[in-house]
């Protein structure tokens, strides 16, 4: 899974950096709130599933929240940005979907400054 990255167009990256920073700030504010209140998170997950046509229970949603926690802003500061992208790239090479010689190019497209700016580090 791409747990440490956002994929954006060149236009958004070059012309709307402020929006990307604000999006990341809002994303982590939401993650912090949801991780800080598991009951609220479970209820919101139940509401989302219900609104999208799935049947579940509050208890099942609470279990899902327990087993798949939200990454908080503090935890994010310890994550190596782009790590999951490299793992995906390695998989692509193993499946012959990417030439091994092109694998190093992946790192050139990872920029951690937006997250660092959003989280203040």
Predicted regions and their residues:
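Generic secondary-structure boundary/loop-capping signal
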Residues: 3, 10, 62, 67-68, ...
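A bilobed periplasmic-binding-protein/Venus flytrap-type ligand-binding module shared by bacterial periplasmic
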Residues: 2-19
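Conserved C-terminal helix/tail region of periplasmic/extracytoplasmic solute-binding proteins
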Residues: 86-121
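Short, structured secondary-structure boundary patches
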Residues: 10-13, 76, 118-121
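Secondary-structure end/capping motifs
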Residues: 14-97
